[in-house]
């Protein structure tokens, strides 16, 4: 889908979630080379000029968080051949997103906060060297709000369950990278969600087709299982 628009002129103006969440950066990195780098950087700059002063969409839901995550994770690629001036602009855009994410986090109701928001907020607090500790109890409450007592994501959709579990792993890795203690709630949630996810696989490796279940997503879901053991073995 991203391939269908990424080479179009001014694609940053297209009203698509793949544009507004900056997922195109991941495609551009795979594309690589000067074309991919220039395409990514200039699209971010143009998008920001167009949308920075808007109040609602595309600053709604968790789009701000997803853009921030994609920019940070692709930072080296985006800036690999940047001038000092271009790098300064990139940093300003990222900083703008951090402050916007923090503002939205305080304003959102607890059931409106996604696992992508948790990653974005954690990155923002730690990079900006703000007090992460005072947010831990609230983050624990957010996790509790989204997982039931059996360790199942409350969407009761295996794909959403796997996405949430993946993001908890990512949250843990970020905290470890910044030498920050991982809350027990995150550790325990990873353990119980892994255990619950294992229960849903048939003996032939397929998943039950209910409430969004789709065997096209089996690899994504299986990739979430026991990721802890995989990462320790690397």
Please tell me what each predicted stretch does.
Residues 1-13:
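Extreme N-terminal leader/anchor segments
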Residues 14-190:
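Aromatic-lined, polymer-binding surfaces characteristic
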Residues 152-234:
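Carbohydrate-active enzyme catalytic cores, enriched for enzymes
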């Amino acid at each position: 889908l991203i391939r269908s628009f990424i080479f179009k002129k001014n694609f940053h103006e297209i009203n698509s979630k793949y544009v507004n969440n900056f997922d195109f950066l991941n495609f551009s990195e795979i594309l690589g080379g000067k074309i991919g780098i220039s395409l990514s950087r200039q699209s971010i700059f143009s998008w920001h000029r167009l949308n920075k002063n808007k109040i609602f969409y595309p600053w709604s839901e968790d789009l701000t968080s997803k853009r921030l995550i994609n920019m940070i994770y692709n930072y080296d690629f985006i800036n690999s051949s940047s001038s000092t001036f271009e790098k300064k602009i990139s940093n300003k855009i990222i900083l703008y997103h951090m402050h916007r994410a923090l503002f939205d986090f305080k304003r959102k109701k607890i059931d409106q906060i996604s696992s992508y928001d948790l990653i974005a907020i954690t990155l923002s607090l730690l990079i900006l060297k703000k007090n992460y500790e005072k947010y831990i109890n609230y983050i624990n409450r957010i996790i509790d709000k989204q997982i039931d007592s059996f360790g199942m994501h409350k969407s009761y959709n295996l794909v959403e369950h796997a996405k949430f579990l993946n993001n908890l792993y990512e949250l843990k890795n970020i905290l470890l990278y910044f030498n920050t203690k991982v809350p027990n709630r995150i550790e325990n949630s990873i353990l119980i969600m892994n255990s619950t996810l294992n229960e849903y696989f048939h003996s032939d490796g397929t998943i039950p087709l209910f409430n969004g279940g789709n065997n096209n997503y089996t690899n994504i879901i299986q990739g979430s299982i026991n990721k802890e053991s995989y990462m320790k073995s690397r």
